[in-house]
Each structure stands twice: as C-alpha cells, then as structure tokens.
Amino acid sequence: MKRKLDANDVPSAEVAEGKEAKDADNTDFENLNLDPRLRQALIKEQFTKPTPVQSKAIPLALEGKDILARAKTGSGKTAAYVLPILQTILQKKAADPSLKATTGLILVPTRELAEQVQSVITKFTAFCGKDVRSVNLTQKVSDAVQRTMLADYPDLIVSTPARVIANLGSSALALDNLTHLVIDEADLVLSYGYDEDINALAKAIPRGVQTFLMSATLTSEVDTLKGLFCRNPVVLKLEDKEDEGAGISQFVVRCAEDEKFLLTYVIFKLQLIKGKVIIFVGDIDRCYRVKLFLEQFGIKSCVLNSELPINSRIHVVQEFNKGVYDIIIAADEQEVMGARTTFKKSKEITDGDEEETRDKMGSSEDEDNEPEDNDKKSAHPEKRRKTSGKGKDYGISRGIDFQNVACVLNFDLPTTSKSYTHRIGRTGRAGKAGMALSFVVPADEFGKHKPTSFPTAKYDESVLAKIVKRQAKLDHEVKPYHFEMKQVDAFRYRMTDALRSVTRLAIQEARAREIRQELVKSEKLKRHFEENPEELKQLRHDGELRAARIQPHLKHIPDYLMPSKGRKGISSENVGYVGFTKQSDNRIRKAREKNRGKGKGRKPSGVRKVDPLKTFNRGRK
C-alpha cells in the first residue's frame, strides 16, 4: 500500500509553489472563500490577516492538493490545515446533513500538542459546533469511554499514532471514509518511536486521501513520510527572517559543573534576565535538583516533565503564557535519553541519494543525530533509555506554543545542534527579541564535582563546535559571555550551602510529593474545575516542595555582597521610609485599654496583691 513518490514530480511541485507565492501577500481571509461561520470564529479570535503559511497553504488545500510545508512553530501551521478541513466538512454536511463519518485525522507526536490542536479546533468551530464534532484520543480515559466517543463517528480525530493503531486494532475506529490526513511536526513523529505505527497506518488508510505534512524542518524522516502518504505534494518552504535563530542573541558560558548552579543563582537573584525564562535540563532528577536549589533562595519556579499528569502539564503551559509564572524548568528527556533515534531509512535510498534529498529539502540536520563517540557511550545514558517509553508522547522543546519567552537557558547542553536549534526556537518569536544562554562544561572540568555531574556534559565541547558551525551557516553568531567572576565568587559559599541541602533523598521526596499533589489537582478536581473555571486560576504549580532543608537566611542578600550596579537594579526607588518606632497605635493594646475603662479585665476590689516571696513558708524537715 506504500505510495512512493516519483522523483521527477518534486521539481514541478515546487514550481507550483512559486506561482502561488506571488499573490500570497494580497490574500485575506475574506478572499479564501471560507464558510461564514468560520470567518465569524476568526473574527472572534482576532485573526485579521493570514500568516504566510496560511495564505499559501489554504488555497492549495481547498483545491485538494497534498501539501508539504516547512514553517516554524508559532507561524500558524495549525490553522493552515484545520481551516480547509473544517471547510470541507461543512460543505459535505450542507449537502448531506445526516452524514456521519470520520473524514479527518490529525496525527501529532505528543499529548501536549494534541491538546493544543484540539483547542484550536474548538475555537474555530465555536459557531458550527453542532455540525462538526472532534475528539482528542490522547485524553486519559478508559478504553470503554474512548470506544463510546468513537461510536458516534466524530468528523475529526486528533491523536498520536499509537492511540490510532490501538483503536484500529480493537475495531473502535474505522478509517474507510477518511479524506484528510495531517501529520503535524512530521520530523518528530518518526523520531519519537512511532515508526511501526506509521507503517501500519500507511496500510490502513484508503487511497486518494489528501495529506498535509507540517514541520519546522524538512529532514530525511519527512522524506520517508512523503513517500508513504503523499501524491505529488506542493512543497512550501517559507524562508522567514525569524526562522532558526534570527533575532535571538546567542551566548555561551564555559564553566565547571557546580558553577552552573552558581551562575543560575546569580542570574535570577540579581535579576540579570528580565522576563520569562525556560530552563532546559537533561532529565527529571535535574529538574527537581534545580528547583529545590532555587527554592533555597526564595526563587519560585515550575517543573515540566513526563511524570506529571497531562492536565497539569497543559495547565502549566497555559498559565506560563498568561504570565502567572516566570520560570519553567523543563526536562528535555526525549533528546537526552536517546528516544530520538533516527528512523531506520529505507535500504532503497543510497547515501548519495539521501544527501541529495537533504540538500533539496533544506534539512536542518547537521550529521549529528547521536552524541559523539558512539562507541564510547557511558553506561548511564543506556540505563536511562529503558525508561524512555514512559514519556514517549511527551515533548517540550518542539511544537508547544510558548509565548513571550525572554530567554532560553540551556542548563544542560543538548547532544545535537538540531536539538539546540529547536530549544532556542522557544524565544525570539513573532518579531520579538530573545536570548539563548548555554552552559558548556570544558573537558578538563567534567566529573570533578560528582553531585552535580551529568553524563552528556562529557560531549559539550564537541557539540558546541557543531552548534557554532551550524549557526554560522545560518549567519548567526554564538558569542562567549563573560561573568565578572570576582563578584560572582562572593556568592559561592551561599551556593555551596544551598547545594549541600539538595540531596538525592530530597530529590526523590520532592518528585513523589509533587506527583501526589498534581494527581489530586489533575484527576479528582478535573470535573469540578470544568464546572467552576474561575477556581482553576487559584491552582499554583510553583509552590515550595520543602523537601530540602530550608535555610531562611539564604533568601536575603547582604548589601556587602551586592555589586553597586546590582544594588541599584534590585532596590526600588519607591520604597517608603520605615522608621524605628511604630507610629500607629497597636490595635490589640487599644482594645485592652478600652475594655479596662468599661471595667472589663479588672480584678475584684478588696483583693490585695500577694507577693509570693514574702508569703513563702519553708517546710519543716
């Protein structure tokens, strides 16, 4: 059932894209001939003008063409495929109101992205909800409930490939009437370990399905999907000035392993970075080590990892985007634990053909799918790889639409330049400036401080060389950032005290405690919060875990430690004068005096005061 793409057809598709591109700037939502109900929803959501990917993709999609689009996260890719699918469904329902069939399938690599896509569909169907039904199969419900949801033949399904195959196997889902297939973040779907599911799905879907492949990068994995599902697709490569690091100031700091914590403390306590920050770390333990460390100094932060319930993860991202939280500590587990292994490429494609394909499609991979020295991999990452299946459908460095992120802090450097590009893509979006700061451990410093050591830091220097090379090709510079270490060293003893409190046992307790707390918030209260949405705002995810020994004095910075510039930055000019004596009367003391005047609290008259020392009688022997 595999539908291989004829190599001769690819250039003609790209020519078609060039023709469409001429009129793209003049396109408006009014000119796209969308259903009035969809246009009304767009107005409600304040969509005024289509983005480049929308203006190019929607007309082509309405003509029934397969589309392979390269556009960055946050460029409007979701609306580019959701709107034409909804338009087609509404047209079919207008012709036959009794029609009940699943005609659209949207595949995504992670649960977070599935929830995000479902949210967009809900907004666009605000005025046609009775005519269009959509279901998110990644929700944490029983198989019986999911079977009931599918029994009514929803028009549109959002899911990971694994959930689709599971429901196909149990006959709960039928794809006989499928007309639209979308694979969002296509380059990740295969590298997240869904290769077997994708192959099974290619055999299950009917011929002639219109396919959308959406990705931030066009890699060999996307080429594999194109061969499986597409028929002479139109290739849209949207070269945006903001793409892949433009507008982002990139800095790197060479430091020892324990100095990562020292510099992080100084950055946040002295407020060297203004705005929202995402801290990327290697695994879940590192998440809680950094969180507990920052707690010692009264710095609040949220943790985001695959152990937390999906509802909690989604709520954290939503509240972060609203500005409720300023710091998120995210575990980029898929990247570090090796779950992003490359898809087994077809043996029919030779190395030369593959390289030619990458050049054609603008691959962002720089021959660095694995950490350096594959034959010298440490045993530690291999052990972690066993647990990677648990977070298979979790991913935070790609796909999720973080908004107004001022800085990405690579606390642990990723193992590939591709992952680095995806991480820094969380900032500097929508024309705004952003900053990426990465900590790099020199080879001679690796392993010197075992409590804070992380296995992948062994490859930091070689990975950095690839990152610099990759960014140079894109005309971006990775600059060294130098801290004034004489001033920073003044904080070292405080960092050492705090780090000593964050033991392995404290980290385990913190993990267990937060999971218990989030499970209560996520599961038991889910329905309550659906009925009372205002109370959901009261839920906080940045509370202190208090698993480590708290030292209150660390929350205060003495003036003698503060550099003169930093003292001005932190101290507020508007703080009023606070005297040594209290000017206003004490409320309780005032009440006592009033009561005494009324006779309350007085001792009965005639009772003489007794001096216990004068009335003390020595007992007889």
UniProtKB/Swiss-Prot annotation:
Compositionally biased spans, kind Basic and acidic residues: 16-25
EC number per UniProt: 3.6.4.13
Domain Helicase ATP-binding: 58-236
Cited PROSITE patterns: HELICASE_ATP_BIND_1, HELICASE_CTER, Q_MOTIF
Region (Disordered): 1-30, 342-393, 581-621
Biased composition (Acidic residues): 364-373
Annotated residues for binding of ATP: A71, K72, T73, G74, S75, G76, K77, T78
Chain location of the short sequence motif Q motif per the record: 27-55
Any one GO CC term of the record: cytosol
BP GO terms, sorted: maturation of LSU-rRNA from tricistronic rRNA transcript (SSU-rRNA, 5.8S rRNA, LSU-rRNA)
GO MF terms, alphabetically ordered: ATP binding; ATP hydrolysis activity; DNA helicase activity; DNA/RNA helicase activity; RNA binding; RNA helicase activity
UniProt KW keywords: ATP-binding, Helicase, Hydrolase, Nucleotide-binding, Nucleus, Ribosome biogenesis, RNA-binding, rRNA processing
Pfam families hit by this protein: DEAD (PF00270), Helicase_C (PF00271)
Catalysis performed (reactions): ATP + H2O = ADP + phosphate + H(+)
Keyword Ribonucleoprotein carried by entry: no
PANTHER family linked: ATP-DEPENDENT RNA HELICASE RHLE-RELATED, DEAD-BOX HELICASE 56
Domain text: The Q motif is unique to and characteristic of the DEAD box family of RNA helicases and controls ATP binding and hydrolysis.
Membership in a protein family: Belongs to the DEAD box helicase family. DDX56/DBP9 subfamily.
Full protein name: ATP-dependent RNA helicase dbp9
Protein source organism: Aspergillus clavatus (strain ATCC 1007 / CBS 513.65 / DSM 816 / NCTC 3887 / NRRL 1 / QM 1276 / 107)
Organism classification: Eukaryota, Fungi, Dikarya, Ascomycota, Pezizomycotina
